[in-house]
């Protein structure tokens, strides 16, 4: 075997490998003989078919099988011999096979970059200092009351923001109805901003059974090209107005939650505080991790293999489709939509792997248990959830990876510049929500 490995671009390489004809012909001959021992052909007993007939019938496929095996085997040897760190799937470029002549083929592939972590002491992290106080508990209680609210029809009062309304509407532009502009028994909570600007405000002040028109202009950024910036008229028939009623915080209200019988309001508040503290702890850890990783990447920018980016794009597209009811649309989105995030994730993976390898980090079983318990606490039966995870190898691998990543983050934080920033619970959780929404 003769080998020439050359760099074609950044992390891309090409291996040109020449295989000796004697080795190929011997392997083909051995395979023909082996095939003849078990071959069946009309007019011959099993294993008694002449070699020349075997070659006529199976020779080409045997030759192809041998060449494929040789190409893969000798490329694997090349990778070991040249001490190359292969990334992604290699692309084989077969040569032309001529009997009794040496066979030359090429393989195009990528290698992992050589990561040399630097400037770790320049990593900057802003640590949120968040206190959970009684006002935050009160706000959560109010939120829980709203989740349990009931609706009562009010026939004599005009619609207000916060009301739930049921109505028919017909929209038109220049006197012509447009697609999606007509609906019957449409239910909407006023003030949620689900319609074009001015629509909900146009209903406020009207009473049940009224029929009226509102004139609106579609936003310039509206998704339908034919309606962008167009003035439209909506004929509305208001059929029902409902106002919400919040439950009192009493024994009946407490029964809605998974608490022991005859629990007090104080017990409910304590449970709420515990759950909020758990979510807060997770959110703070997540924020610190995000900042650490962002700073690490900014200080250690490097080229990453395109093949790994392509694999990550596929993974992101599949994940996005699994969470959407518009799977076909997501599958048709251009790959460029996912490219930036995919490249970032690949870089993060490479850098954290280097931190883990350099520091010889191993999984802390206690951390694994903590992660498991945090996940399980969000479910109705935590013990069953933990058992479910422990019996699922894929899920447990994810937990182990999270625990290992956490070990890497802690190593990075030892040398990082950390500044503390006091912030209210509500403001911090708002920031977390906005960040999560932007990343979706």
Swiss-Prot record:
Recorded catalytic reaction(s): these are: [protein]-peptidylproline (omega=180) = [protein]-peptidylproline (omega=0)
- Quote the cellular component terms of the Gene Ontology held in the record: cytoplasm
Alphabetically sorted, this entry's keywords are: Cell cycle, Cell division, Chaperone, Cytoplasm, Isomerase, Rotamase
Q: In this protein, which residues make up the domain named PPIase FKBP-type?
A: 162-247
What is any one GO biological process for this UniProt entry?
Answer: protein transport
InterPro entries per UniProt: PPIase_dom_sf, PPIase_FKBP_dom, Trig_fac, Trigger_fac_C, Trigger_fac_C_sf, Trigger_fac_ribosome-bd_bac, Trigger_fac_ribosome-bd_sf, Trigger_fact/SurA_dom_sf
Highest taxon in the source lineage? Bacteria
Cell division: is it a keyword of this entry?
yes
List the HAMAP family hit by this protein, alphabetically: Trigger_factor_Tig (MF_00303)
Cross-referenced NCBIfam families, in alphabetical order?
tig
What does the record's free text say on domains? Consists of 3 domains; the N-terminus binds the ribosome, the middle domain has PPIase activity, while the C-terminus has intrinsic chaperone activity on its own.
Identify this protein by name.
Trigger factor
Q: Which organism is it from?
A: Hamiltonella defensa subsp. Acyrthosiphon pisum (strain 5AT)
In the UniProt record, the gene name given for this protein reads tig
């Amino acid at each position: 075997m003769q080998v020439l490995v050359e760099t074609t671009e950044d992390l891309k390489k090409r291996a040109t490998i020449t295989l000796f004809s004697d080795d190929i012909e011997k392997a083909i001959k051995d395979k023909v003989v082996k095939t003849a021992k078990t071959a069946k052909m009309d007019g011959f007993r099993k294993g008694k078919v002449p070699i020349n007939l075997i070659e006529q019938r199976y020779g080409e496929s045997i030759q192809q099988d041998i060449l494929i095996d040789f190409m893969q085997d000798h490329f694997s040897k090349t990778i070991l011999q040249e001490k190359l760190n292969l990334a992604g799937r290699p692309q084989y470029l077969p040569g032309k096979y001529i009997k009794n002549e040496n066979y030359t083929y090429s393989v195009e592939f990528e290698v992992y970059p050589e990561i040399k972590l630097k400037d770790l002491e320049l990593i900057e992290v802003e640590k949120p200092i968040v206190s959970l106080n009684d006002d935050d508990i009160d706000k959560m209680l109010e939120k829980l009351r709203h989740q349990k609210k009931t609706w009562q029809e009010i026939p004599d009062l005009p619609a207000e923001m916060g009301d739930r309304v049921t109505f028919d509407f017909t929209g038109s532009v220049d006197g012509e109805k447009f697609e999606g502009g007509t609906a019957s028994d449409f239910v909407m909570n006023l003030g949620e901003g689900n319609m074009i600007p001015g629509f909900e405000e146009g209903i406020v002040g009207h009473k049940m059974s009224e029929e009226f028109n509102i004139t609106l202009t579609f936003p310039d950024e509206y998704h339908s090209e034919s309606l962008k910036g167009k003035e439209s008229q909506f004929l509305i028939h208001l059929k029902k107005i409902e106002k919400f009623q919040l439950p009192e915080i009493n024994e009946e209200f407490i029964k809605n939650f998974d608490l022991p019988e005859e629990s007090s309001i104080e017990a409910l508040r304590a449970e709420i505080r515990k759950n909020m503290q758990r979510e807060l702890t997770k959110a703070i850890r997540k924020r610190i991790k995000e900042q650490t990783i962002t700073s690490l990447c900014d200080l250690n920018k490097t080229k990453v293999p395109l093949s790994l980016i392509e694999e990550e794009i596929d993974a992101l597209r599949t994940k996005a489709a699994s969470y959407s009811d518009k799977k076909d649309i997501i599958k048709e989105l251009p790959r460029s939509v996912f490219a930036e995030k995919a490249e970032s994730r690949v870089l993060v993976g490479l850098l954290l792997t280097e931190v883990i390898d350099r520091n010889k980090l191993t999984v802390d079983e206690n951390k694994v248990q903590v992660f498991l318990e945090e996940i399980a606490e969000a479910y109705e039966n935590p013990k069953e959830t933990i058992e479910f995870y422990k019996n699922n190898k894929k899920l447990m691998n994810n937990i182990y990876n999270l625990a290992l990543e956490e070990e890497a983050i802690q190593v990075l934080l030892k040398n990082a510049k950390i500044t503390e920033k006091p912030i209210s619970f509500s403001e911090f959780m708002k920031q977390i929500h906005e960040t999560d929404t932007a990343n979706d």
